[in-house]
Amino acid sequence: MAAVSPTTRCQESVTFEDVAVVFTDEEWSRLVPIQRDLYKEVMLENYNSIVSLGLPVPQPDVIFQLKRGDKPWMVDLHGSEEREWPESVSLDWETKPEIHDASDKKSEGSLRECLGRQSPLCPKFEVHTPNGRMGTEKQSPSGETRKKSLSRDKGLRRRSALSREILTKERHQECSDCGKTFFDHSSLTRHQRTHTGEKPYDCRECGKAFSHRSSLSRHLMSHTGESPYECSVCSKAFFDRSSLTVHQRIHTGEKPFQCNECGKAFFDRSSLTRHQRIHTGESPYECHQCGKAFSQKSILTRHQLIHTGRKPYECNECGKAFYGVSSLNRHQKAHAGDPRYQCNECGKAFFDRSSLTQHQKIHTGDKPYECSECGKAFSQRCRLTRHQRVHTGEKPFECTVCGKVFSSKSSVIQHQRRYAKQGID
């Protein structure tokens, strides 16, 4: 038997349109958000499976739509036209008329289940039959033409049934680090990058790396300046529809994501996930310099600036620099005018609500932050952090003049004033 070249084997694969999921308007409206998210995962995974076969597949419009956060394509089931397919199209890499072991490749069973549709948004890629001929007919040895006609109507109903089966199947892929479960291995792989810190998708413009391809796609729009999704209330524009949806909840006040522990609600799922780490004590983001761990990646990023000494956020009014944008915002309110937030107990005013909240703990005596070593309690987390350095011996603040180290920032500032009085820079 003659060897089959990789090119020939590639030609025997199915097209993307064969595995695309199609819903009608009515079917789509019945799906809840988590099912719609799964739909996107299934579509993107099927597309990536076709691409992984080595075929020169152009990116269909529906995939482009999904990456931008648009609704998927939907078609009307009425007036569907007939479409003819060969009775046996090989989905395997070998030149065999059929797949003998359906359990061999799970994706192959799904692909075969999806035959019989055509989408106006998916360009038609060429399908080759096992005998190498291209088209919708397969000649039998006697020369008879055998055809299998499936209406798109039937194909869509078949696909919809399969989609609902996928949407209701159990999650069987479990993360060994945190125990979270997923429907498929690719979703698990993407999730595990949050633990490993892997970022395989690099931006060619600025070099910034991302853990997900969709995040890179959204980021690329920042270079092009394209912000196609505009808020109808305040006209603020966004790169993708999902960001616009989250933003609009600020105007509506909708907070659909609620914490089961304390009942606090949030605008988006990621904020809820970060919040829940307060209850679980999970701190997955560790500093490689000092080993300190944090519950949020943004807090780790700000912390690492302490080691580098870089303060990227500078006040345009006075030139003072800060580690975080929130600190800069609080500072700039001092330039803007009178403080807005006043304490009802003593009348002291503050520029932001968080500072007022911290201050009010003085009156209430609330000290929620307790040292695990000695039991001493504090009204502010930062004071607990400074106190814990007494036990650990950590001194992260270094004098740039003499190299002496200190456990608190205020101590190094006080120390450096001595040099300022002596005229030493």
From Swiss-Prot:
Q: Has the keyword Nucleus been applied to this entry?
A: yes
Keyword terms of this UniProt record? DNA-binding, Metal-binding, Nucleus, Repeat, Transcription, Transcription regulation, Zinc, Zinc-finger
Highest taxon of the lineage: Eukaryota
Q: Write out the annotated subcellular location.
A: Nucleus
**What do the Gene Ontology cellular component annotations say?**
nucleus
Q: Where is the signal peptide?
A: none
Q: KRAB domain spans which residues?
A: 14-85
| Ranges of biased composition (kind: Basic and acidic residues) | 93-110, 144-154
| Zinc finger residue extent: C2H2-type | 173-195, 201-223, 229-251, 257-279, 285-307, 313-335, 341-363, 369-391, 397-419
Per the annotation, which location comes first and is thus the protein's main one? nucleus
Q: Name one Pfam family in it.
A: zf-C2H2
Task: Report the InterPro entries cross-referenced here.
Answer: KRAB, KRAB_dom_sf, Znf_C2H2-type, Znf_C2H2_sf, Znf_C2H2_type
The entry sums up its family as follows: Belongs to the krueppel C2H2-type zinc-finger protein family.
Q: What is the purpose of this protein?
A: May be involved in transcriptional regulation.
Name-wise, this protein is Zinc finger protein 2
**Natural source organism:** Homo sapiens (Human)
What gene codes for this chain?
ZNF2
